[in-house]
């Protein structure tokens, strides 16, 4: 660690953000969407366990903890229940409203029942001048989002370091930075905010991948920890929390720690060998896999592809090898040039049907239906032969 060993550390933090509890995954089938939504609660236990494992002094939760300002009670009740189970007394937790769950008069943060359920060591950041004294001569400044969008930099509400102030100063806000192209900027955070406000660590939330902002400045650091569970296929480096060690010289060392169950992956298969290789993988059980198939194969290999799809996805009687599979098989086509040679055992009337369907498959408007019918006749021929 920078500046000495464990004895030199004066403050340890766990920084998390963007839980998005209550998020719905409408592009997935109902049972898959439920599994993904529930996993957003399950990851909280792994986050809190990581805090205990690293013996942190403070847990910072930097906004968008709920996917909307007024989530169903089942979400905020479970947050309170899972926090209460930790039985922490000397490890304060700070919950920051973000732009998805801003501090509004009717929001979850104003819900008296939710507040009463929370342990006394859990603090909601409910004012723009929030300040809290931390152990070992440290202080936290935090600024909540009070609307879904805004053009002001929330760090401007954090007081600058006064002459002679030697405390470890931590900031926590939720918003966008200017280092990502084509990203909608909401509650814009200046890249030099950690410097201009005299902070030793700036904990931020909003984007869903772990990164330093800017990437080449590690001291003092501004950090997005990322969403602890991914929410989309295009996210870069989601699934972590940031564990932060600050030494006597006020230098912060930041370590990402993975807590996610799911890894989201997109894959294209364009050959049977690609598909066979995918099916042999042993790491698919915790994958959310978007699989796109694009190939044209003869009937025996088409049949093999059907079997491999079933192995990946599962059936009503057995689990598939992939945790959650989003399969697009529109690009899988039956090679019809030699399909008649596989149907010689059929009665002549069905062989005549094969020839008609083969001709129909040349028409793009009829191709898909004709190919499925030809495959069915191939299966009939196989059964007859056996």
What are these regions (language model features)?
Residues 2-10, 39-40, 45, 49, ...:
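A structural signal for the main folded, soluble domain(s) of proteins
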Residues 10, 55, 167, 198, ...:
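Short loop/turn motifs at secondary-structure junctions
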Residues 1-77, 366-371, 379-386:
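N-terminal active-site segment of His-dependent metallophosphoesterases
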Residues 14, 139-141, 242, 265:
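Conserved beta-strand elements of the Class I
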Residues 33, 58, 69-223, 227-232, ...:
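His/Asp/Glu-rich metal-coordinating catalytic cores
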Residues 3, 7, 246-386:
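Accessory, non-catalytic peripheral segments of nucleic-acid enzymes
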Residues 217, 236-239, 262, 284-286:
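Short gly/pro-enriched beta-turn/loop segments at secondary-structure junctions
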């Amino acid at each position: 660690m920078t500046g000495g060993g464990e004895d030199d550390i004066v403050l340890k933090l766990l920084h998390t953000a963007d839980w998005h509890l209550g998020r719905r995954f409408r592009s997935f089938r109902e049972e898959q969407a439920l599994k993904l939504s529930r996993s957003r609660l399950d990851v909280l236990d792994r986050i809190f366990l990581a805090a205990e494992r690293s013996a942190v002094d403070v847990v910072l939760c930097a906004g968008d903890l709920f996917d909307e300002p007024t989530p169903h009670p089942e979400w905020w009740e479970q947050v309170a229940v899972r926090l209460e189970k930790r039985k922490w007394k000397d490890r304060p937790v700070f919950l920051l409203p973000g732009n998805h769950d801003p501090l509004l008069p009717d929001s979850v943060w104003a819900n008296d029942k939710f507040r009463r359920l929370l342990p006394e060591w859990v603090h909601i950041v409910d004012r723009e001048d929030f300040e809290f004294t931390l152990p070992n001569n440290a202080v936290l400044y935090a600024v909540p989002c009070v609307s879904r969008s805004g053009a002001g930099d929330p760090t401007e509400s954090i007081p600058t370091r006064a002459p002679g102030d030697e405390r470890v100063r931590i900031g926590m806000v939720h918003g966008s930075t200017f280092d990502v192209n084509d990203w909608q900027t909401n509650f814009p955070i200046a890249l030099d905010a950690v410097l201009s406000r005299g902070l030793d660590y700036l904990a931020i939330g909003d984007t869903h991948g772990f990164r330093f902002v800017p990437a080449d400045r590690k001291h003092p650091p501004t950090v997005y920890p990322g969403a602890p569970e991914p929410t989309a296929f295009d996210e870069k480096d989601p699934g972590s929390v940031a564990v932060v060690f600050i030494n006597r010289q006020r230098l912060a060392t930041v370590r990402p720690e993975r807590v996610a169950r799911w890894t989201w992956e997109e894959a294209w298969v364009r050959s049977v060998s690609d598909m066979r290789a995918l099916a042999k993988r042993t790491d698919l059980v915790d994958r959310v896999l978007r699989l796109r198939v694009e190939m044209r194969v003869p009937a025996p290999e088409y049949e093999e592809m059907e079997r491999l799809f079933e192995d990946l996805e599962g059936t009503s009687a057995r689990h598939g090898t992939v945790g959650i599979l989003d399969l697009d098989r529109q690009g899988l086509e039956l090679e019809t040039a030699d399909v008649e040679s596989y149907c010689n055992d059929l009665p002549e009337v069905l062989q005549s049907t094969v020839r008609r369907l083969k001709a129909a498959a040349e028409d793009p408007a009829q191709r898909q239906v004709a190919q499925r019918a030809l495959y069915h006749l191939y299966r009939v021929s196989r059964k007859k032969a056996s």
